[in-house]
From Swiss-Prot:
UniProt GO MF annotations: ATP binding; proton-transporting ATP synthase activity, rotational mechanism
Coarse class of the protein's main subcellular location: membrane
Family named by the database record: Belongs to the ATPase epsilon chain family.
Gene behind the chain: atpC
Source organism: Photorhabdus laumondii subsp. laumondii (strain DSM 15139 / CIP 105565 / TT01)
InterPro entries to which the protein is assigned, alphabetical: ATP_F1_dsu/esu_C_sf (IPR036794), ATP_synth_F1_dsu/esu (IPR001469), ATP_synth_F1_dsu/esu_N (IPR020546), ATP_synth_F1_esu_C (IPR020547), ATPsynth_dsu/esu_N (IPR036771)
Coiled coil start-end: none
Name listed for the protein in its UniProt record: ATP synthase epsilon chain
Membrane topology: Peripheral membrane protein
Amino acid sequence: MAAMTYHLNVVSAESRMFEGLVQKIQVTGSEGELGIYPGHAPLLTAIKPGMVRIVKQFGEEEVIYLSGGILEVQPSGVIVLADTAIRGKDLDEAKALESKRKAEEHIRNSHGDVDYAQASAELSKAIAKLRVIELTKKAM
């Protein structure tokens, strides 16, 4: 028996990252982790910086880094509108480690709520990139 699927589009301001049939996706919404399967109730939510893990029609997996965005689930399909989206294989580990180091230093030297919030957001993005790199390496 064939797996149930739905149509997924992952797009950013720069490009269309993925379009096709999937069994499920996993993404971090504003209220926590979301697993979207065929027949999911309609939903509109903000996406936190992190990753979208895609299980394609025939079971292959792909991981894409998202800097944030919007997730829309409708009966006709699912759309991920990302601010920035980068395939795991295209991320630069050295740059991500350097971004993480700079954000940690910025947090230590922050002198106010705004500085701390900005540095914390940058740290979250760097950690998310490193996690996507790690998962992409494991899949290879």
